[in-house]
């Protein structure tokens, strides 16, 4: 014993070959031999009397780091680009000081790595995680003879397996990106040369200043200023769904000077220079100018976003010719491509915490073993060797198992026929779906269909609903026929209908003999379709003119032509749109405007009915728009034209200057024509879905930008507010005192469904953020109206801050929901007809709201429960073998000798047990039907009982018990040769692990049976082939089988009995419904 304490230790068993380093260190070799001799002489003396304790583990999942490393490498090894404006000349490229500037190439590169950086970056990404770094250090320590434990393959094998899978996955993903990039860079386009001829050019070879030709249904390869189209009117429609997610066609206008040229070759003969601002991210703004010099004549013109085609948009009509102003990384599409922050699931964080506990346990257990052995000058070597021996407590394969499981969950959700076209865009957080406590939902397009139907028009003195629209048509036709006085009621109705038919951005498209309408908003399409039903049809529209087809009482058709002078498009900031038209029959010039009542009420002449009727319509659940007009004299038009042109030519603050001119000169003293009401119908099965989610313990909040009355109406009709709810509407809050009073009023009520305007929310959060979180979260349902996109995200952050660790999900369908979706723990986007922004930004994409029930209650449950079981079994697998190792060391005087050698240790966690444990990802504790029928089952998941410190301790105790039984049992029943201890204990260990998996299964699947059979068969073959580890004659005897069976029965039977009794006398909820 004294000699052994003075020397360093190595690993071996008496009948196993010692793994000694090839180093010539005589001290180390002599120590190993001495240690082996002592172990061999002590085995028979210490087979009956010892007990030991062990531990349990979990591996840390890390989802946040990869993108950071990618950014780091780019920032370290790439030169910072300086963005600046540029002036390009048609046919000559950049001119002036820009002629010497090297602009970014037009190559598309989405690859993370190149051939040299691939291995270093991937390895860096992996070893920055503590778990992988820990195992790397353990593996490297095996090259030090003094602390070597067994064969290096024991430690390098699992680490190499994990790294190989990671490298293969990353290489495959990057190769797919490379192929996609190569296809885009190799696309062919036509370029105009100085002499006007066309040549073919690759997309990657396009440069700033090139004049290129883009045909219909082709991708725009760079940001170009539109010079000419084949459409006679000069209209060019583009699809922007790959840029901003919106599926409606956008109208783009070429430069008038070049559009009027006879053919495209004439463009190259112009002395034309285009100035473009420095590259920026805003896809809705562009500042530029165009200058054409012809002898002594200089023509200047302004350029805005309507004159530009952004890269990655698609030409939807005709052929376009444009000059390239931005390429490559300076294009709007690339500058708006941000790497979203990776989300980390709560389960991953819990597993990470358990991993830290296990690491601490390894240190404590190793320290105890060293202390029990006795401290001397070489204690640190003993400590290192014990840490190496017990390193299996921290299973390196856990992270790989969880990552593979997440990919399987994503595949399974994607092919669920009950929720078709569901897309998983973030495969790292499927378990989050199983623990949602708050669901924040948009209204329009999410709870409602975003299919608008015109329902009501109010003219101040009389209102017409859908059942009286035929009467409206009679009035309008009579007015156009000229039978009534100018100021009669019919004439007023005519003016209102005509204004609705003209004030929009709708374009009729004729395809295959049918007419369809393209517009940015479904509200506008609903209005135009309604005017058609009452006899005023939008016949045609181009950049400069619009025609209406009016049905007269005698059956004839009257065509009215209007010249479009100016269009002021709708934005979410202005909440209105306007148009100035000139009637070509009467030469009357009129400004027509429509918009939200909140902004239009301050622009129209005094009236006593607008606010009241807006509230009435909102209570009916209708979306309202105020329509108004203002006749303009020629002098007023000319004055506006001069001021507006001057604002358009400004380089800085152009948009603001233009808006100021419009507001100052036009948006005053408008004549109120009518108030329109459009209905947005509820999505299919919304009411039953909300009830199902509420029964599942999920609190549902509706966040909308609509009016208070409309929001309340939809909340009631959808079932968000139940009949028993006491609806509390927040009053006007302007200051801290108001907020304090309103919050006190709310505090005194119970079973409250809260309605809070966005303005009140802002004030309350400014002064009483914590109190708002406490009181609002206690409400049964919450509706926030007049909510901006920023406020939606702010509400999500409020819940995340004050209700952690409860999980928050957000669901929406539009661009205004993106910030909310990205801020939530789980973002769900609805793939809407009008746009894909929310769908593309979300973690999960569905096609309708009702699908969220199956996504959460079925797939969310399965993902969470399966990952919990998988994590605990991987930890159990490492704990049980470490328990056996600890007992083995204690029996033999705390020797740091490995119980199992080389291939056995590697195969234990891979070939023999990996498939059965991983097969738990197809287990189901309840059927999908029962999960939806009994939504109350979902409530229990939020408590986190499937993986908690309690369950962790239970599995630790199970591992300690089974490890002790197997190890002590093997020592008790073996006869003479120590190799029999290895055979019996390792066989009992493998069979116990397979039986434990089988005992955990709730619903058997063919993949589980196959995994069990393959693993058991592979191990039985190993018993025959690995004669260096097993005595072939012994393992084929009945003695071996009986001893192994007995030990396995003692380790598993008591646990089975306890489980059976528990299911009989205290069954879990899922067992009751089954």
Curated annotation (Swiss-Prot):
**Top EC class of this enzyme:** translocase
Query: Where does the sequence pass through the membrane?
Result: 118-138, 143-163, 354-374, 378-398, 886-906, 954-974, 978-998, 1006-1026, 1038-1058
Q: Per its Swiss-Prot or TrEMBL entry, what cofactor is needed?
A: Mg(2+)
Topology of this chain in the membrane: Multi-pass membrane protein
Pfam name, any one = E1-E2_ATPase
Coiled-coil-forming residues are none
Top-rank taxon, per record: Eukaryota
Span list, region Disordered = 1-26
One Gene Ontology cellular component: plasma membrane
Tell me the GO molecular function terms.
ATP binding; ATP hydrolysis activity; ATPase-coupled intramembrane lipid transporter activity; magnesium ion binding
Low complexity biased stretches:
10-26
Query: Please, one GO biological process term?
Result: phospholipid translocation
Q: Which positions in this protein are listed as binding ATP?
A: 442-444, 524, 570, 575, 594, 623-624, 704-706, 786, 792, 816-817
Name the residues annotated as catalytic in the UniProt entry: 442
Q: Where in the cell is it found?
A: Cell membrane
Residues binding Mg(2+), per UniProt = 442, 444, 813, 817
- Enzyme nomenclature, EC number: 7.6.2.1
Name where it mostly resides. Answer: membrane
Q: Which PROSITE patterns match?
A: ATPASE_E1_E2
Reactions performed catalytically = ATP + H2O + phospholipidSide 1 = ADP + phosphate + phospholipidSide 2
Query: What does UniProt give as the signal peptide span?
Result: none
Please describe what this protein does.
Plays a role in regulating membrane trafficking of cargo proteins during embryogenesis. Regulates snx-3 retromer-mediated endosomal sorting of mig-14, a transporter of Wnt egl-20 morphogen. Together with mon-2 and pad-1, may participate in the formation of endosomal carriers that direct mig-14 trafficking back to Golgi, away from lysosomal degradation. Required for Wnt egl-20 gradient formation along the anteroposterior body axis and migration of QL neuroblast descendants toward the posterior part.
Family (UniProt): Belongs to the cation transport ATPase (P-type) (TC 3.A.3) family. Type IV subfamily.
Please state what the protein is called.
Answer: Probable phospholipid-transporting ATPase tat-5
Task: Give the organism the record lists.
Answer: Caenorhabditis elegans
Instruction: Give the source lineage, highest ranks first.
Output: Eukaryota, Metazoa, Ecdysozoa, Nematoda, Chromadorea
């Amino acid at each position: 014993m004294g000699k052994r304490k003075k020397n360093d230790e190595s690993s071996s068993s008496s009948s196993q070959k010692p793994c000694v380093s090839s180093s010539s260190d005589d001290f180390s070799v002599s120590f190993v031999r001495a240690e082996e001799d002592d172990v061999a002489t002590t085995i028979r003396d210490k087979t009956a009397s010892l007990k030991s304790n062990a531990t349990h583990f979990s591996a840390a999942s890390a989802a946040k780091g990869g993108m950071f490393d990618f950014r780091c490498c780019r920032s370290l090894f790439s030169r910072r680009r300086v963005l600046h404006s540029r002036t390009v000349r048609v046919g000559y490229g950049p001119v002036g000081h820009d002629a010497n500037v090297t602009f970014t190439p037009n190559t598309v590169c989405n690859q993370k790595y190149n051939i040299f950086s691939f291995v270093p970056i991937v390895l860096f990404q992996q070893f920055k995680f503590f778990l992988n770094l820990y195992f790397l250090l353990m593996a490297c320590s095996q090259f030090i003879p003094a602390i070597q434990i067994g064969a290096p393959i024991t430690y390098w094998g699992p680490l190499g397996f994990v790294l190989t899978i990671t490298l293969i996955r990353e290489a495959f993903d990057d190769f797919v990106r490379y192929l996609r990039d190569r296809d885009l860079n190799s696309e062919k386009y036509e370029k105009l040369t100085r002499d006007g001829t066309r040549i073919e050019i690759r997309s990657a070879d396009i440069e700033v200043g090139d004049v290129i030709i883009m045909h219909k249904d082709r991708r725009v390869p760079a940001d170009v200023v539109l010079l000419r189209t084949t459409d006679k009117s000069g209209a060019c429609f583009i699809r922007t769904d790959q840029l901003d997610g919106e599926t409606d066609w956008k109208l783009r206008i070429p430069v008038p000077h070049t559009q009027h040229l006879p053919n495209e070759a004439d463009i190259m003969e112009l002395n034309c220079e285009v100035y473009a601002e420095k590259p920026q991210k805003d896809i809705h703004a562009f500042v530029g100018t165009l200058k054409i010099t012809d002898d002594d004549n200089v023509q200047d013109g302004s350029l805005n976003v309507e004159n530009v085609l952004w890269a990655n948009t698609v030409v939807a009509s005709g052929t376009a010719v444009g000059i390239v102003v931005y390429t490559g990384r300076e294009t709007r599409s690339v500058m708006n491509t941000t790497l979203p922050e990776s989300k980390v699931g709560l389960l991953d964080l819990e597993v990470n915490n358990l991993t830290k506990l296990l690491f601490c346990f390894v240190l404590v257990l190793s320290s105890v073993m060293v202390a029990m052995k006795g401290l001397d000058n070489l204690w640190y070597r003993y400590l290192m060797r014990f840490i190496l021996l017990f390193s299996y407590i921290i299973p390196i394969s856990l992270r790989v198992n969880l990552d593979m499981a997440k990919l399987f969950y994503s595949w399974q959700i994607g092919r669920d026929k009950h929720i078709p076209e569901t897309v998983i865009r973030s495969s790292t957080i499927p378990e989050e779906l199983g623990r949602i406590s708050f669901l924040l939902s948009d209204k329009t397009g999410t709870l409602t269909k975003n299919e608008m139907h015109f329902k009501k028009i109010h003219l101040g003195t009389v209102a017409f609903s859908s059942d009286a629209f035929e009467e409206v048509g009679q009035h309008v036709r009579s007015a156009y026929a000229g039978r009534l006085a100018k100021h009669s009621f019919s004439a007023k109705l005519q003016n209102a209908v005509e204004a609705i038919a003209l004030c929009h951005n709708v374009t009729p498209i004729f395809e295959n003999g049918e007419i369809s309408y393209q517009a940015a908003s479904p509200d506008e399409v609903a209005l135009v379709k309604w005017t058609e039903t009452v006899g005023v049809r939008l016949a045609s529209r181009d950049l400069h003119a619009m025609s209406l087809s009016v049905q007269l009482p005698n059956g004839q058709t009257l065509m009215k032509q209007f010249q479009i002078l100016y269009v002021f498009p709708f934005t979410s900031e202005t909440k209105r749109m306007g148009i100035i038209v000139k009637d070509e029959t009467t030469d009357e010039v009129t400004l027509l405007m429509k918009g939200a009542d909140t902004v239009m009420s301050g622009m129209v002449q005094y009236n006593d009915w607008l606010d009241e009727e807006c509230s009435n319509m909102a209570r009916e659940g209708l979306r309202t728009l105020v329509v108004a007009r203002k006749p303009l004299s020629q002098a007023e038009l000319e004055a506006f034209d001069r001021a507006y042109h001057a604002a358009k030519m400004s380089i800085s603050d152009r948009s603001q200057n233009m808006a100021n001119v419009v507001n100052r000169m036009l948006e005053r003293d408008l004549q109120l024509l009518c108030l329109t009401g459009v209905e947005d119908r509820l999505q299919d099965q919304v009411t039953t879905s909300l009830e199902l989610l509420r029964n599942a313990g999920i609190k549902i909040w509706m966040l909308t930008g609509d009016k208070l009355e409309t929001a309340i109406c939809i909340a009631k009709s959808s079932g968000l507010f139940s009949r028993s709810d006491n609806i509390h509407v927040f009053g006007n809050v302007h200051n801290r005192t108001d907020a304090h009073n309103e919050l006190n009023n709310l505090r005194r009520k119970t079973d409250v469904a809260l309605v809070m305007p966005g303005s009140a929310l802002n004030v309350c959060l400014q002064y009483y953020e914590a109190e708002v979180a406490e009181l609002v979260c206690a409400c049964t349902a919450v509706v926030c109206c007049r909510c901006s996109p920023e406020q939606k995200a702010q509400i999500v952050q409020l819940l995340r801050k004050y209700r952690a660790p409860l999980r928050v999900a957000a669901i929406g369908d539009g661009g205004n929901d993106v910030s909310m979706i990205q801020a939530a723990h789980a973002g769900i986007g609805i793939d809407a007809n009008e746009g894909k922004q929310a769908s593309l930004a979300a973690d999960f994409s569905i096609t309708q709201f009702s699908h969220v029930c199956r996504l959460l209650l079925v797939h969310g449950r399965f993902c969470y429960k399966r990952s919990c079981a998988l994590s605990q079994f991987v930890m159990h697998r490492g704990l049980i073998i470490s328990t056996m190792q600890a007992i083995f060391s204690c029996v033999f005087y705390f020797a740091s000798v490995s119980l199992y050698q080389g291939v056995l240790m590697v195969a234990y966690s891979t070939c023999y047990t990996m498939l059965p444990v991983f097969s738990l990802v197809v287990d189901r504790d309840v059927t999908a039907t029962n999960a939806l029928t009994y939504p109350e089952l979902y409530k229990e998941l939020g408590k986190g009982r499937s993986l908690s410190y309690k369950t962790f301790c239970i599995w630790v105790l199970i591992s300690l018990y089974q490890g002790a039984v197997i190890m002590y049992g093997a020592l008790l029943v073996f006869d003479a040769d120590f190799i029999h201890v290895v055979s019996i204990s390792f066989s009992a260990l493998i069979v116990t692990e397979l039986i434990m998996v089988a005992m955990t299964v709730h619903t058997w699947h063919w993949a589980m049976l196959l995994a069990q059979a393959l693993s058991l068969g592979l191990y039985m073959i190993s018993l025959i082939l690995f004669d260096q580890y097993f005595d072939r004659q012994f393992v084929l005897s009945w003695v071996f089988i009986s001893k192994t069976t007995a030990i396995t029965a003692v380790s598993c039977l008591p646990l089975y009995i306890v489980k059976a009794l528990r299911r009989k006398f205290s069954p879990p909820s899922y067992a009751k419904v089954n």
